Design a protein with these regions (language model features):
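Extended amphipathic alpha-helical repeat scaffolds
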Residues: 2-8, 13-172, 182
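Alpha-solenoid helical-repeat scaffolds
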Residues: 119-266, 273-276
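Alpha-solenoid repeat junctions
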Residues: 152, 180-184, 212-216, 243, ...
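Amphipathic alpha-helical scaffolding segments comprising HEAT/armadillo-like alpha-solenoid repeats
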Residues: 153-165, 185-198, 216-228, 248-261, ...
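Short inter-helical turns and helix N-cap capping residues of alpha-solenoid HEAT/ARM repeat scaffolds
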Residues: 168-169, 200-201, 229-232, 263-264, ...
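Residue-level detector of extended alpha-helical repeat arrays and alpha-solenoid scaffolds
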Residues: 170-173, 204-205, 236, 268, ...
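Alpha-helical adaptor scaffolds
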Residues: 437-439, 445-466
């Protein structure tokens, strides 16, 4: 009876199995190839070409895109074909804006952008607006695209401003503001200011504040927003962030003045965080270090510590260690450890290793271990030594977890060693679980042998079954069925049945039918 209930629950679980996610393959093509696939339309100006597109599309009675290129602001990218990125990302619909650098430190930019307007064929009303990168392959929802060529800035900005101001103020208005901000034109700043001061739509106002920082040269205006106590707090915080993102020289004195004059604690922390992005590194470092050492608000100190590790300075490690040693608040100490990990220096790794071994606070030891794992291959030797010398099982499990984040044959060898060795059961289970996450023939064979052992540790065997269930169904399902049929321990069989129920695999369902029919 118990087994039948388990099987029924397993079958219910099949219906709830999630679909696998797909990933973007970063397909690209020459922008000229993209444009050549569109239908060109002619006209004296942008409005004339929009009318020409309307006339061309009227006979088809299907939604259609009208699209045009424009002069694109430098320092920003839309859906760039990159896999590693450091900076900020903001997504609106199908448009993802990147502001930052590649892994090698190069500014990410995309200059071949176009504004796409999807229209209803009956009313000719715009139902959707996107800014697309012409270097990326797209299907455009299967609708025809009428290409209007390149619009000059004046006609494009005037057209978009009318859309942004039209009622109701909805997603279309917000996309229009984004499109305006992406233009390389001196008039953009005044248009954004107008949205900030007059729009009743808070999303439009917040987006405009963000882009004021990217436009540059607007720190005085942004600082006035931060100081304005009658303004929405979200807008004030966004303005502080925009000052830090502006890359304008001389922003630190402005931020320091705001830090000293603003009374709201949360807003002051936004000001501190903004300093971590400022282009003037020396004054920014001095400002942040002073707050990290002496501000009476521990949350302000923690906020100041976070970005310190990103500064490329010889004295960063020792300054962070002084903060770690002298500050009495646990969260500030944790932030100091995370900042140490970001410095990427051998000296910082040595300090983290020392704390991981010797600190009297177990939570801080574990934090140090986790941050060491973020250092990759450089930390493997220290983590292996730490595991071998450690006596506390919970800390040993933390070391294994940190090691598992590193792609290394030595790490896999260690996981096998621990899984087989005379270690505490919880530690062995941790090693087996982590082996299950490593896709290799060797690890699968080990999990199979462990799960099917007739005289093994039941808890360890159950963990092996769970780990097997995380593998590809081609590997896992036949083995789980075998375990469910033949394992001498009924607890292991039940675990295999539960795991089968979570796979959604037709072979698992057939097995359940077979068993229930008996």
């Amino acid at each position: 009876m118990i087994r039948s209930i388990i099987l029924l629950l397993a079958i219910v679980g099949v219906a709830c199995a999630p679909a696998a996610a797909t990933s973007d393959d970063l397909q690209t093509q020459n922008p000229n190839t993209t444009v050549q696939s569109f239908t060109p339309v002619e006209g004296a100006d942008l409005m004339a070409r929009l009318e020409a597109a309307k006339a061309r599309a009227s006979s088809r009675q299907t939604p259609y895109w009208s699209a045009y290129a424009f002069d694109v602001r430098s320092g920003v990218a839309i859906d760039p074909a990159i896999r590693e990125f450091s900076g900020s990302m903001n997504t609106m619909g199908d448009t993802t804006v990147f502001v930052g650098t590649t892994a090698s430190g190069m500014t990410v930019e995309t200059r071949n952008l176009a504004i796409f307007l999807l229209r209803d064929p009956a009313s000719n009303q715009i139902t959707r607006m996107e800014v697309y990168n012409l270097e990326r392959k797209r299907e455009y929802s299967g609708y025809p695209v009428y290409w209007l060529g390149r619009a000059n800035n004046e006609e494009s900005l005037n057209y978009l401003r009318a859309i942004a101001a039209a009622t109701p103020l909805d997603q279309l208005s917000e996309r229009a503001v984004l499109a305006i901000a992406l233009h390389d034109d001196a008039r953009v700043a005044d248009m954004l200011k107008n949205f900030i001061t007059s729009s009743p739509n808070q999303r439009i106002r917040s987006s405009s504040v963000y882009w004021m920082g990217q436009v540059g040269g607007q720190t005085t205006f942004l600082a006035s927003l931060v100081r304005n106590e009658s303004e929405e707090k979200k807008i004030r915080r966004s303005a502080a962030h925009a000052i830090g993102q502006s890359r304008d020289p001389g922003s630190i004195p402005i931020l320091q003045g705001l830090y000293e004059s603003v009374k709201d604690a949360e807003l002051r922390r936004s000001v501190i965080s903004a300093a971590g992005n400022a282009v003037d590194e020396q004054p920014a470092y001095t400002f942040l270090l002073g707050i990290a050492k002496s501000d009476p608000d521990w949350q302000a100190r923690r906020t100041a510590v976070r970005p310190i590790g990103r500064f490329k300075r010889d004295d960063v490690t020792e300054d962070l260690m002084k903060i770690f040693t002298n500050d009495t608040h646990l969260e500030v100490k944790r932030s100091a450890l995370r900042a140490l990990a970001e410095t990427k220096t051998p000296r910082a790794l040595a300090r983290l290793s020392e704390i991981a071994r010797n600190d009297t606070n177990a939570e801080l030891r574990k934090t140090a271990i986790r941050t060491m794992g973020e250092r990759g291959e450089a930390a493997v030797d220290e983590l292996l030594k730490l595991f071998d010398s450690e006596q506390v099982p919970e800390v040993k499990r933390t070391v294994l977890q940190a090691l598992s984040e590193i792609k290394s044959e030595r790490v896999e060898d260690k996981l096998f060693e621990v899984a087989k060795a005379n270690q505490p059961t919880d530690v062995r289970r941790q090693a087996i679980r982590l082996l299950g996450e490593r896709v290799s023939k060797r690890s699968f064979e080990f999990l199979s042998a462990t799960a099917q052992s007739a005289d093994g540790n039941a808890e360890v065997q159950m963990q092996a079954v769970r780990a097997i269930s995380e593998r590809r169904s081609e590997e896992s399902v036949p083995l789980l069925i075998k375990i469910a049929r033949t394992h001498p321990n009924h607890l292991i069989r039940k675990q295999a049945i539960r795991s089968l129920g979570e796979t959604g695999d037709p072979r698992a369902i057939e097995y359940f039918r077979e068993v229930l029919s008996k």
